[in-house]
Structures are given as structure tokens and as C-alpha cells.
From Swiss-Prot:
Family of the protein in this entry: Belongs to the QueC family.
NCBIfam families: 7-cyano-7-deazaguanine synthase QueC
Substrates-to-products reaction catalysed: 7-carboxy-7-deazaguanine + NH4(+) + ATP = 7-cyano-7-deazaguanine + ADP + phosphate + H2O + H(+)
EC number(s) reported in the record: 6.3.4.20
SUPFAM superfamilies: Adenine nucleotide alpha hydrolases-like
Protein's UniProt name: 7-cyano-7-deazaguanine synthase
Gene3D superfamilies assigned to the protein according to its UniProt record, in alphabetical order: HUPs
Xref: InterPro entries: QueC, Rossmann-like_a/b/a_fold
Superkingdom of this protein's organism: Bacteria
Binding-site residues for Zn(2+), renumbered to this chain: 185, 193, 196, 199
Molecular function via GO: ATP binding; ligase activity, forming carbon-nitrogen bonds; zinc ion binding
């Protein structure tokens, strides 16, 4: 199935790109510049596209991102430290982000004759991000069926929506994903900070999967404290 992968450059989406490529269906990667403070992730998406030998389309959505205020990812608020499941991480929500990006990706699929759009939303995202939940992805498919009725048919592929990030690490390793060439940290510094929710989740996922983590962190041990505090709460 000819498939576009929505690729941020993060561990999840790059692993998904490698999986789809191994299945023989990858046609292109699509990424979005929405003014995110961790824009360096797009460089890792470009690396993945070159490695996999497919076109990489970067959609400039900085004007859209500028009006999606209130998120630490696009505004001046600090990205909080701690586990993803913490209530404080809600400040990293960018309203309607996945709905907007997937709509553009489906339009591209219809225009270019691709049959599917794959996105790496996973079970660990459900607590914080409503547009990563099964209810959203199912409703989005129904909306696109209506939007493209009589013009094109495209499927939304969400192979990780009921799986954990540790499962994604396992799947990525199976398909030789170079994890060191992915970017997760929301703070966008020279190294992964090791303290924000996505760094903690990344470090924990490698631990649970039993696979060595090649990532260099500014604080490589904070994740244990964050998990312990979550468990005590």
C-alpha cells in the first residue's frame, strides 16, 4: 500500500517510517514546521528521508502555529520537567495539531495517488493529547471518507495506537532504526535534556524494552526520580 508517513523526526515516527519502508509501502515523509521550539527535530526527519531514499516534504505552518497559543511548544512558557502522565504536561498540548497535520497529509495523499497516511500516535499519548486517542483517529477517518468521497480513498494507519512507547522501541529495533538519529526533547537544546516529559518517556521506553539507549542526555538519571514521584502520587 503506497503510504505517506507523518514524520516529526522523533523516535516514534522514524521507527514507523522504517517499519513501513520494510513492508515496501513507503512513498514519502511529510513534516511540519509550526514554529515549535524543538524545530531541530525536522533535521532528523530529513535524515530519515535520505536514509530511506524517499522525498521529504516540509510544510511551513508557522503562521498557523502562531495563532495556536497557550502551548509551551510554540509560546514562551517553560517546558515542565516530569513524567508525561503528569497534569502539568498539558501545557505542551498544541490545539488541533494532529487534526491539522493529518488533513494536509490526506490532501497530499489524494493529490499524489497515495493510498494511506501513517501516523505514530501511541497509547502513552492518550492521557495528555486528545488527538492521539482512538476516538479521534476513528472519527478522523470517517471525516476524510466524506471529504474525499468520489475523488480519492485513503486510509489512516495507526499501528501503535494501542501500544506503548516501549513496544515502538522494540519494533524500531526490529527494523534497524538508528535511534541516535532521532530527536524527542521538547526543549530543543544541544542535547536531550533528560528531564522533560518526552525525554523521561523516551528513557523509560528503552529501559522497559530492554534495549540500550544510545541517546546523550544532559541529565541521564532524572527519569528514575520522575517515575518514582508518579508512582507515589
Amino acid at each position: 500500500m503506497k503510504t505517506i508517513v507523518v514524520c516529526s523526526g522523533g523516535l516514534d515516527s522514524v521507527s514507523l517510517a522504517h517499519m513501513v519502508a520494510a513492508q515496501g509501502g513507503l512513498t514519502r515523509l511529510i513534516s511540519f514546521d509550526y514554529g515549535q521550539r524543538h524545530r531541530k527535530e525536522l533535521d532528523y526527519a530529513a535524515l530519515a528521508a535520505r536514509r530511506l531514499g524517499v522525498p521529504h516534504h516540509v510544510i511551513d505552518m508557522r503562521g498557523v502555529g502562531a495563532v495556536l497559543t497557550g502551548s509551551a511548544l510554540t509560546g514562551g512558557a517553560e517546558v515542565p520537567d516530569g513524567h508525561y502522565a503528569e497534569e502539568t504536561m498539558r501545557i505542551t498540548v498544541v490545539p488541533n495539531r494532529n487534526a491539522i497535520m493529518l488533513t494536509v497529509a490526506f490532501g497530499m495523499a489524494a493529490a499524489m495517488g497515495d493510498q494511506a497516511v501513517a501516523t505514530a500516535v501511541h497509547g502513552g499519548d492518550h492521557f495528555i493529547y486528545p488527538d492521539c486517542r482512538p476516538a479521534f483517529t476513528q472519527a478522523f477517518q470517517q471525516m476524510q471518507d466524506a471529504a474525499l468521497d468520489g475523488y480519492a480513498q485513503a486510509r489512516l494507519l495507526t499501528p501503535f495506537v494501542h501500544r506503548t512507547k516501549a513496544d515502538i522501541v522494540t519494533e524500531g529495533a526490529r527494523h534497524d532504526t538508528p535511534f541516535a538519529e532521532t530527536w524527542s526533547c521538547y526543549k530543543g537544546g544541544a542535547l536531550h535534556c533528560g528531564r522533560c516529559g518526552t525525554c523521561v518517556e523516551r528513557r523509560e521506553a528503552f529501559h522497559l524494552a530492554g534495549i540500550p539507549d544510545p541517546t546523550a542526555y544532559e541529565d541521564a538519571d532524572f527519569w528514575r526520580q520522575a517515575i518514582a514521584e508518579r508512582e507515589r502520587a
